[in-house]
């Protein structure tokens, strides 16, 4: 049975279509990584793969709903998982309610190692995207890799 995780919601200071376009191409993830983290990471439009702490992890786009959500699934990973990125419009024009859902089939050992860290990681992703959209770049992030005006 898969473990379910949901990030907190964050209001990103960009419209849903900007976020959708940013995340719909897996090559953008590679471009946003700091140079020292790019070794062993490859990407094309639909897939991204990396070796992290000796584990090979691959991700592929399962489905795209324009300007609303992107569903990702494992591709050659040590466990099965599914990620949904939500880009919901808010009452304020030009803002997005962003959140992430994750379902992962973790064995007992992985659940003990990763279970508590997954929730924190999902929340950090939301916080970082909110910060970037408001011009506060996390260390190691190159603002030139984002669409024009994204981090301003």
What are these regions (language model features)?
Residues 9-13, 60, 86:
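Generic structural detector for well-ordered beta-strands
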Residues 1-42, 152:
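Hydrophobic ligand-binding cavity/cleft-lining segments
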Residues 26-32, 121-128, 132, 136:
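Conserved short hydrophobic interaction patches
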Residues 127-152:
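Short, highly charged C-terminal tails/helix-capping segments
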Residues 19-23, 29, 48, 61, ...:
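Hydrophobic pocket/interface hotspot
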Residues 30-33, 37-78, 150-151:
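Glycine-rich portal/gate segments that line the openings of hydrophobic small-molecule binding cavities
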Residues 76-127, 131:
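Beta-strand/loop substructures that line and gate deep hydrophobic ligand-binding cavities in soluble
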Residues 3-9, 47, 56, 69, ...:
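Intrinsic-disorder/low-complexity, polar/charged segments enriched in Ser/Thr/Lys/Arg/Asp/Glu/Gln
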């Amino acid at each position: 049975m898969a473990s379910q995780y949901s990030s907190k919601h964050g209001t990103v200071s960009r419209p849903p279509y900007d976020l959708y376009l940013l995340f719909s191409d897996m090559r953008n993830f590679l471009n946003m990584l700091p140079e020292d983290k790019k070794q062993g990471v490859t990407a094309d439009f639909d897939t991204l793969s990396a070796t992290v702490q000796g584990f090979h992890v691959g991700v592929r786009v399962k489905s795209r709903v324009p300007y609303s959500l992107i569903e990702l699934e494992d591709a050659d990973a040590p466990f099965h998982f599914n990620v949904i990125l939500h880009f919901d419009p808010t009452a304020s024009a030009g803002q997005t309610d962003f959140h992430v859902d994750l379902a992962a089939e973790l064995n007992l050992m992985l659940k003990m190692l990763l279970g508590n860290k997954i929730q924190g990681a999902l929340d950090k992703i939301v916080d970082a995207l909110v910060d970037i959209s408001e011009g506060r770049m996390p260390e190691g992030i190159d603002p030139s890799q984002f669409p024009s005006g994204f981090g301003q």
